[in-house]
A protein has these predicted regions:
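Domain-level signal for soluble alpha/beta catalytic cores
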Residues: 1-119
């Protein structure tokens, strides 16, 4: 992981371009709607690897690891919450291998889960 100073030094060299759409491109590559994206990617890594390589080749210097819902609340519904750390490590490793030389960022999405009322 970069320190704040290391990241600031990278930013001082000019703008950093991030990758683009992942989920919709994975669906175009055959990922079914409504599946666990992270689980599908680990079972079918080639579409993600190809996509991330294409983004890196196009000039992206930061590539998101596909960790959108790889957190305990979302994974609990699938019975995978105990594997949260392992899933994230595999997804980050896959991204690092697909886009060497790029920075890898984690990514998280909103949840359709609500907190209990404090009343």
């Amino acid at each position: 992981m970069l320190t704040r100073e290391e990241f600031s030094a990278i930013l001082a060299n000019g703008p950093l371009i991030l990758d683009g759409a992942t989920g919709s491109n994975l669906q175009k590559a055959g990922m079914p709607r409504g599946c666990c994206t992270e689980e599908w990617i680990l079972a079918n890594p080639e579409p993600l690897v190809n996509l991330q390589r294409a983004y890196a080749k196009a000039g992206s210097r930061i590539v998101y690891a596909p960790t959108f819902q790889a957190q305990p609340i979302a994974l609990q519904a699938l019975g995978l919450d105990a594997d949260t750390e392992k899933l994230n490590a595999k997804l980050v490793s896959l991204t690092r291998a697909a886009a060497p030389g790029c920075l890898v960022a984690g990514d998280i999405t909103t949840l359709a889960t609500f907190c209990d009322s404090w009343d």
